[in-house]
Amino acid sequence: MFNGRAREYNTDTISNSGFWPHIEIAEFQKQRAIPLQINDQMIRPVLIAAMQGVNIDLQAVEQHYKEMGIKSAAQISNDYIDGENYAETLYKKAVFARAKAEL
């Protein structure tokens, strides 16, 4: 929506547990078309809660891969598109969908 204000994205990164990828707030804002009216003080906690929820849901998956010697989602597959493998992309998609639904 045009409102005369230039879009400024939050360049912060939310660090994750080590297995799943970190989340860049700007990537969420761009991919999910988050309106300017939703400020950073609302976005960050919602993303953190979404990350925590998805991490809980994927505990068994993470444990399975760790037992196979895989230390991070980046190592799950060697097939990369635009710098990410399918596990990283799907993780971010799940987090972003949850966060946007809560906003």
Regions inferred by a protein language model and the residue ranges of each:
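Conserved short "hinge" loops at termini or chain/domain junctions
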Residues: 1-75
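Domain-terminus/edge residues, biased toward the C-terminal soluble/receptor-binding domains
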Residues: 46-58, 73, 77-103
